[in-house]
Structures are given as C-alpha cells and as structure tokens.
Design a protein with these regions (language model features):
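Helix-loop "lid/cap" segments that line or gate small-molecule binding pockets
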Residues: 51, 55, 70-75
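A short structural micro-motif
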Residues: 54-55, 90-94
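Crotonase-fold acyl-CoA enzyme core
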Residues: 1-45, 68-69, 76-77, 81-85, ...
Length: 98
C-alpha cells in the first residue's frame, strides 16, 4: 500500500505470493496450481471464489453472514460426506459437486 516496488523474494517472504518460479516457468506453474485447485470439491471451490468476488463489495457483517451460509451449505453437501468417508477409508475423495 506504500507504492514501493518489491522483488519476488520479498513478496514471497511477506506472504503476498505463495510461490516464485524461474523465468519462463510461470505458465506451467499456473497450470499445476489450477489442477490442484480443480482436484478439490467443486462446490467448495465455487463458493470460495464467489465469496472472494463479493468480499470487497459488501460490509463485514454481510460478508460474515454469507460465509456462514456458505459453510452451512457445504457441511450438508454430499461432497462433505464423501470427504469424511474418504478420510476414514484412507483413500482419495471422489467429489461430484453435490
């Protein structure tokens, strides 16, 4: 917020970015990250993206209410039950987006 330019190492150190890659490897790194995100429960990922989009457009109390609503939807989802079953059975989850 100071307008001061920072380098990649400092951005990583302060948590502004979660990874620094060598020049020319950014597309492959982004593809790997996208695959990792896509492997998660689609309903949870979609709601998280929606909350991020809404976050800067609503006040804190509205955002917290929306987050609570999203959590209640997710906790009742088939994907939540599948995640718990997969953990108990020590296998990868098979999420369906329901």
């Amino acid at each position: 917020m100071t307008g001061r330019m920072i380098g990649a190492a400092e951005a990583l150190a302060i948590g502004l970015v979660n990874q620094v890659v060598p020049p020319g490897e950014h597309v492959a790194a982004a593809a790997r990250l996208a695959e990792e995100i896509a492997a998660n429960a689609p309903l949870a990922v979609g709601l998280a993206k929606r909350l991020v989009d809404l976050g800067s457009n609503v006040d804190k109390h509205t955002f917290l209410a929306l987050e609570l609503l999203a959590q209640s939807v997710l906790l009742r989802s088939e994907d939540a039950r599948e995640g718990a079953r997969a953990l108990a059975e020590r296998r990868p989850p098979r999420f369906t987006g329901r």
